[in-house]
Amino acid sequence: MIPPEPGLDGDADAPAPGPPAPATAEGYQPDALPIARRLATSPLFFPLWFRGRLGPETRMPMVGWFDPAQLLSTGIKSLVSLAVGEQSDRRIVQALASRRQEYYDHAIHYRDGSRGPQPAKDAVRDELWLDFICDTGDGWNSTYAVAYAAAQRSLLVPLDGGPVALPRGDVLVFGGDEVYPTPSREEYQRRLVAPYTAAFGDDAPAERPHVYAVPGNHDWYDGLSAFTRLFCSDIGGRRFAGWWTRQRRSYFVLKLPHRWWLVGSDGQLQSDLDVPQMEHFREIAERYMQAGDRVILCLSMPVWVYAQKYRNMGRVFDETDLIYLREEVFAKRGVEVKVYLTGDLHHYRRHQETAESAAGEAPVQKITAGGGGAFLHPTHEEDVSVLQEEAVTDDARARAFEVKATYPDMKRSARLAFGNLRFLFKNPRFGVVPATIYLITAWLVGAAAGGEAPSNPWRALRVTVDAFSTHPGLALWCAGIVLGFLAFTDTHSRVYRVVGGLLHSVAHFSAMFYIGWGALDVATRWLHASGVLRAALAGVGTFIGGWIAGSVVMGIYLLVSVNVFGRHSEEAFSGLKVEDFKHFLRLHVDREGHLTIWPIKIERVPRRWRDRGEGDATTSRVVPDGTMPVELIEPPIHVA
């Protein structure tokens, strides 16, 4: 008989009688896990189970831009990216790593091979369809609605003469800000890759479409690392959902049929086209483009709008790089930029060159189409009905442009702004910020007043004024709050900053005073509390009141700012989280070489989705639970 082996405690560990233990993986001892980990799998101990874990298939909500944690995280990342972005420009590294000045030829057909797309035998294209989608990768409903529409083999859109079928784009171009709020591999997967994978589904076309992407400022917040891995790297295979990826840099040039070209530029964080990028475009123009060729130029932001908006406010944005690229790189070779496409502003707005400026030629189009999934931006906050370029070279003519279409229209945009009256309900977590400020202020005032409980508001006001005059720390705290409101005010005018910031401060301080005194009065006279209990009850009341009143004041401030002064458009509409009014562009180079742009809109995106059923005529894995009408924003735009 073989004796048992001695245990670690020196005693013999004889096997216990009974049935043998179930087989487990070698080295795995579940009984040795921490108690909380073992209990977490039991439904009786569900509080220990982390139910909020996000998987790659999670249907993400719209980004809560006014959530305190989100505000802090995004603010820090944007400041860091601005501080180090200029010194760690990944575009320079890309230029050094890929010295070939190459373009991607889509004037030919491709076939799918084991090593990616290869030119087909009967290669020459006589026409091409191209989709342009900007500002996507936000909430599931809005992002997937656009992805679903773009991924269908054909879209039927109504026209006066009857519905027209628009085939899916042979090429998909993302025009910037592919993910929100900040880039990471996880966010790209959840907010961009997963929706487009589900939308493309199990479709297996004979010739898969290709995808290219221009990075926006949100893609740059990590130095472009996640973007580069997804769109510019061989890691993980050259696939994005059902599309092939091919680009090696964050900027690219596509050759299209009939002497059309598409140029995708990378303006980093400040709409700055770096020298290697300019030289890349210049060399391709010199070697491959010919006089009479036409260019579609894609940018990450509408610099023509920002230049007009800030022209008299310090020239924060200008069109110098844009005009230099047009005049010095292309025009000197007889190549003309006919269309400018961009996003960044999450609405649709088309500017067309005026007849006087075009001088008998086909007018140039400048189109902002940022409706790929992100929250809606207003169209009524700024007068950009007429844009005037500034000539930056002696032989360049200054061109004028006028608005031809906006979506949503300006009146509807102004009406949507009234949603800020429900700011409290649309951004419930934001209330912790004013609630904390109100509570700390009331606490400091109460401590300075020696715990006195004034019986009327006039006495309370006098006690408060005395507290400020005799306690410098309290005065400095409140001065810091005022400075914060002044800094928050969205303006380049010192007068408006002071007036707007002070009025905003007065509104909050008034709410603080009445809520703080009211909570103390209720605790004293109604609840007959005293001492620590009174202070605790008054603190709870002040916190709750600050949560509600602070959010209401913020909503009113944003509404007045955007509808009266045309300021805070970003804040006023990001808090609304409008999922609707989504859109994208479908471009068509036809057999005769004419370019037509179809601006496609989804007025209301579905809120309910279901898995594809047997009777659904689509390859998408998820379909709307109901109808999703697709229409045109305006009649198709015939460029040339």
Language model: regions and residue ranges:
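Active-site-proximal segments of metal-dependent phosphoesterases and phosphodiesterases across multiple
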Residues: 141, 269-279, 290-339, 361-362, ...
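Active-site neighborhood of phospho(di)ester-bond hydrolases with catalytic His/Asp-centered motifs
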Residues: 133-134, 170-177, 207-217, 265, ...
